[in-house]
Amino acid sequence: KNLPQTDVGGPWAIDAQITRGSYLIEMGHMTENNVDEWIAAAKSIGARQIDVHCGKTLRFGDLEPNLKAYPSGFDGVKRAVNKLHAAGLAVGLHTYAFYLAKESKWVSPVPDPRLGKHKMFTLANDLDDKDATVRVKESTKGMSTITGFLIANSVTIQIDNELIIFSEIETNAPYAFTKCTRGALGTKPAVHAKGTNVSQLRELFGLFNPDGDSTLFDEVARRTAEVYNDCGFDMIYLDAIDGAGALMGNHTPGYYQAKFIFELNKHLKKPALMEMSSFDSHFWFARSRMGAWDVPSKSYKMFINNHYIDNLTYAKSFLPRNIGWWAIWDWTPKDRMRMFPDD
């Protein structure tokens, strides 16, 4: 009885009209002032939906609008969505699931104690508000300062209400985090007493995440539902949900993925056309479409062939399948093969 109930997902997805047709992903360039241009672009390629990719115009996690794009905040977002609806287009909210921007309200200016923690330490001595070296009692052996979009590692530690970014690590006793930036990410440098907890935050995709077993995890899901409801969105794409392994809580990644999806669906006022960047049998009841792959950067024709073969397998899911995503690459980057007219 606790399974998500939606007439555009699971057993009803294949008959729902909204699950058909192409969608245009806007990567943070649409504003309240240029919506007409996006409507024209969508119409020119026969797209029936515009997917608003969060990150630039809506902040990951708390989904607060960028005031440069929407000076009047959510009122401007609602006007943009209404204009797209008037043009006959559905509108998608493309989030990074439970991941949180480093500027979000749960991180800055006061970091939430429910943020996901990786390694835990104890201050070895009193720390004033200017010290650039944080000494800890426990070993730091095996820790790294290497971070990146696909690297599950963070150089940010939390002590009380302060975040500190370290540049180097002393892995031999006395153990320490060195060359530190105090009061990082808009927090306030402070004095901390010997014996205080020092927590390395969890990070992936350049974003923090909540403790998967905390109330913050559910709070992020409810916030996503709130913005979806208030702004009148029609679709939700839960990108980055495949990064649930970085939560490393008391359960498997699939548990946290399903937990987030179930909590989100409980608070939606209208059914959402829903996709996500991972799949498990527990998601099927809420999922509306299958087959979205990230854009290829080379071997475009082989990509289509492989995608088609994979979609044959997903025919057993009884969900509509697509063969996106696509991007038209220019000739600037050095790390991708050029796109030619027959691509």
Where are the predicted features?
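Glycan-recognition surfaces
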Residues: 102, 106-122, 202-219, 265-343
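Aromatic-lined carbohydrate-binding/catalytic grooves of carbohydrate-active enzymes
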Residues: 17-120, 202-221, 225, 229-254
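Beta-strand-rich recognition/accessory modules
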Residues: 1-19, 28-36, 40, 334-343
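Long, internal scaffold/assembly segments composed of regular secondary structure
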Residues: 256-261
